[in-house]
Amino acid sequence: MEFVRALWLGLALALGPGSAGGHPQPCGVLARLGGSVRLGALLPRAPLARARARAALARAALAPRLPHNLSLELVVAAPPARDPASLTRGLCQALVPPGVAALLAFPEARPELLQLHFLAAATETPVLSLLRREARAPLGAPNPFHLQLHWASPLETLLDVLVAVLQAHAWEDVGLALCRTQDPGGLVALWTSRAGRPPQLVLDLSRRDTGDAGLRARLAPMAAPVGGEAPVPAAVLLGCDIARARRVLEAVPPGPHWLLGTPLPPKALPTAGLPPGLLALGEVARPPLEAAIHDIVQLVARALGSAAQVQPKRALLPAPVNCGDLQPAGPESPGRFLARFLANTSFQGRTGPVWVTGSSQVHMSRHFKVWSLRRDPRGAPAWATVGSWRDGQLDLEPGGASARPPPPQGAQVWPKLRVVTLLEHPFVFARDPDEDGQCPAGQLCLDPGTNDSATLDALFAALANGSAPRALRKCCYGYCIDLLERLAEDTPFDFELYLVGDGKYGALRDGRWTGLVGDLLAGRAHMAVTSFSINSARSQVVDFTSPFFSTSLGIMVRARDTASPIGAFMWPLHWSTWLGVFAALHLTALFLTVYEWRSPYGLTPRGRNRSTVFSYSSALNLCYAILFRRTVSSKTPKCPTGRLLMNLWAIFCLLVLSSYTANLAAVMVGDKTFEELSGIHDPKLHHPAQGFRFGTVWESSAEAYIKKSFPDMHAHMRRHSAPTTPRGVAMLTSDPPKLNAFIMDKSLLDYEVSIDADCKLLTVGKPFAIEGYGIGLPQNSPLTSNLSEFISRYKSSGFIDLLHDKWYKMVPCGKRVFAVTETLQMSIYHFAGLFVLLCLGLGSALLSSLGEHAFFRLALPRIRKGSRLQYWLHTSQKIHRALNTEPPEGSKEETAEAEPSGPEVEQQQQQQDQPTAPEGWKRARRAVDKERRVRFLLEPAVVVAPEADAEAEAAPREGPVWLCSYGRPPAARPTGAPQPGELQELERRIEVARERLRQALVRRGQLLAQLGDSARHRPRRLLQARAAPAEAPPHSGRPGSQE
């Protein structure tokens, strides 16, 4: 292995290059250069353009890789002015330093360009001019030292594009109209060299005209005489800006086809007032200026690298230039040597392919578009792309070379064809003309109602002289009329239009063809344009163009309105959504309760300690109120977490109910059911049931197909068919319907469905019998191939798609916007489920009331007797109060005997308004309220401090304080003479008060037993204070010690 490696190294040393590794001179040349090659630059004068060019040059100088790792150094020429003397001195100063290989300039005017042209030839220094303005005329003979790169469209390239467009249209004799041209003779000579033949007519429009009349007079030589042809078939307008070109084109006479030679962007192209068929061109996808600067620097660097491989000294060390003493530098100067390599350099740059022709013209990739002014499907003028030119190759769109000049005024050179059509929406519509008998839109057509040839000839003759009956005049428009107008413009031909007399497509009846086919065979019409299906039977007797519309047969049915079921109001949401909403409601209520009772700020006994608490029933009430937008009083959570969760639940309910409301109207209008048919092979069609009727249009392609393929079906449907498509649709939508299904071309059925305002029509089943619509012509007609070619071009160019979008772009059923006066009426049947739900709610309320009474009378006493389940605040405040505060129903049997004493009984029976209570009453009321709160909270500890009790005992007694029901102060004692029966009434009242006191004492014992002994003393002192005044009467009952 070591031997093999040594042998390989020896062969490499013996066969490899010498020790120099290149040219023997580079070492000395590099030492003199100092590691860089200089490139002079004459920058623009404008500050922004100057900064932009300097930045682009600085970036471009870093990109190229020169031989021997040399760099590119820029030497900027800065003349104080741009007059010839100052410009020459500035350029000469830039060429004085040694090593300046070439000069890069940005001339802004033609004098600068000429001065650079002469300076480059005098000094034999390569000068590369980057032209940023529009096309200019060439500078005479090519100068090998002055290379020009046009960033804008060069004149030579522009003329090449125009010549290619003229040759594509076979226009040989051309007229030129020149605007603002400094050298008309040079431009004409350049045109002759590019086109191969001189222009037939040249008009100089450089002089300004005072008005349109003078401009028309100067353009008159281009006009076509009356009844004759124009002197030239095409005219080119060159050198005009957009404003001047518009004035000229608005004044051009009829005759030639005009081409706008000024390149314009698409957005700057005008449309109004210009002649139809005008051709224009413009450069698209122009590379940025920085890319052009990069490529021109790259051109110099590549040429220097190639020259340095041959003669490094001559390529990299050019002699300094002395403009004051120009001496010849031998047979080939360094500048001429470098120019030779510049002229033979080509590469792929940032702008695309870059190459040099004629030793002075630098080319980069160009892309032009050719536009034609035509009319869109709506009749408005619009620019349409008809071709594309790239690097010398013109590619025309289908139909792009079909544009022909309009006929001159008064000339009748085009053939006039008689066209028959048939009303079939949306392909052909008809309406009455205006008051003047004219059609503001569409084409004037006749509705003769007959197929007699003599009658048709007489009617069209009367129409020509304006004496045709007004009742027979119609305005025809639609899909096929737009197609016919486009064909008449492009072919070209004139036409006169009429509606077929019998209103039929055509079928063989008794050995004769009817309808459209019959008119073509009889010679009454030269062309039939409508939704004319191509089938084998018709193709045997007439010719068809290539199909312009593809369709099939379809089946249309009508919807049947059915009554909404009881649960229709729940249809807007799926059952799983309803279940999820109510599950989320109860879960949210549970979390609201948990957060509120766990919070130190909640509405609970341990939180805010209010007289009300937030329980689970409160949470449910709140969640249901938010969900159904009820404006009822409900407790709200007080803790921040609960409020946040409550707001989130409100957002959830808002979105759910908004979706429900949005879908409610669409769902509750009633269900629509359709006749289910799978297609033409459905058993309902082949074996129709009693009362099932279906049909088609007489003598149509659909009837011919069914008659040929399904004779039995045709025998059944024959008596139910209709004369026209609209009549068949009317039979389907009548009430009661006369048809259950209608079979016809799917393109026609789809249009009927799209315009159905009631949304009752639908096409069902799979399409069958694929067919196409074509233009019918007599057999061996010379127009068949031409029209077929144009139709194919229209398909590929997108014109057919535009027609389809124009006439089929209808608002689909179910998505239309209703008018202000239109309403969706919903009957009582739509709300039957809601009424049933309300009745169920009333029944549920009755059951809930019975359950409430059962719980209060049966379950509550059992819970009260037990020692568990006594704390219900977190669930229901009412149940908790019933267990811990309210006396049970029927407790009279459990009470002990107790005698009521004092005037308390009399005070509780007062019904009249009472005076203001004294201060002692207020203190006692506050004490009772506090005692009630302690009992409500079920706290075993005494809430009143001992110090407060001592102070209360030590304070002077203000007299007895009586507490009456409803918080009212006691009434004044009666005075005066006794009344009859007053003693008996008082005794009765005393007995009632004694019974109530006995019940209160029993309840007090029960509470003390539940709360424990620690809470005995404070309530006892309070009750003793209340009962002290009542001990005075001798019959007042038991002493207070026996409580």
Curated annotation (Swiss-Prot):
Segments for region (Involved in the trafficking and surface expression of NMDARs): 979-1012
Chain intervals for the UniProt region annotation (Disordered): 882-924, 1012-1043
GO molecular function: calcium channel activity; glutamate receptor activity; glycine binding; glycine-gated cation channel activity; ligand-gated monoatomic ion channel activity involved in regulation of presynaptic membrane potential; monoatomic cation channel activity; neurotransmitter receptor activity; transmitter-gated monoatomic ion channel activity involved in regulation of postsynaptic membrane potential
Recorded superkingdom: Eukaryota
GO-annotated cellular components: monoatomic ion channel complex; neuronal cell body; neurotransmitter receptor complex; NMDA selective glutamate receptor complex; plasma membrane; postsynaptic density membrane; presynaptic membrane
Entry keywords, A to Z: Calcium, Cell membrane, Disulfide bond, Glycoprotein, Ion channel, Ion transport, Ligand-gated ion channel, Magnesium, Membrane, Postsynaptic cell membrane, Receptor, Signal, Synapse, Transmembrane, Transmembrane helix, Transport
Identification of the protein by name: Glutamate receptor ionotropic, NMDA 3B
Biological source species: Homo sapiens
Taxonomic lineage from the root: Eukaryota, Metazoa, Chordata, Craniata, Vertebrata
Gene: GRIN3B
